Amino acid sequence: MNDHLKRGNLLWEGSRMFLPEHKQSLLERKRLKQKLQKPILDPDKLEEMNQTLCAAMEFAQDITVSCFQDGEIVCCTGKICRYEEFEKAVWIKGDEDQLYKLKLDQVLDIVL
């Protein structure tokens, strides 16, 4: 009888061990598969967001901004404290005096 057949299932015994590195690598692979593609916004939506942004800056209102970052949609809430036209970015001051710098090309939605 062949030596491989005599071992039975012992050939695969080593694969039963699962190291923390294996688990971390599998979770990372699963997270990468779940990443979203950045949606493409139509011009009407961009114009609506621009008007909402201008109104929030003019009247110092709180806004909620949804952004696309690293394959995920992240929301932040606060008041606009600075608009950088050259960098096309908005600085938002959150509830706990946190500053968020959001690039306008990553913004998906703005709600008053």
Curated annotation (Swiss-Prot):
Pfam family membership, one: YolD
What PANTHER family is this protein classified in?
IG HYPOTHETICAL 15966, YOLD-LIKE FAMILY PROTEIN
Q: What is this protein called?
A: Uncharacterized protein YqjX
